[in-house]
């Protein structure tokens, strides 16, 4: 089984552009609606794939601000320092500076343009590191 997070944005096209510039995602597929909004896209970072689209009535309400969301996305990256600098240069709202953790990871956190909380670090879950 695989888990593929799905994120819906008010401006999915803008979000995709930001995720590419700030966090290094690569767009694998993109399908637009007749009105030009993004119906479905697939973005990859390393071995991980997430799906991004435009929020639509009946599908999922897109909040005005994700700052109160109780979920975030954590991605392990190889060159965390370079990733952090790239995110900062692209205008990501860094909410937690680079830091070492007591569980052996180095991490930082940032929000994208619509407030989705992203976490990046060197931690690899134990089940995956075996």
What are these regions (language model features)?
Residues 9-13:
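Short acidic-aromatic low-complexity motifs
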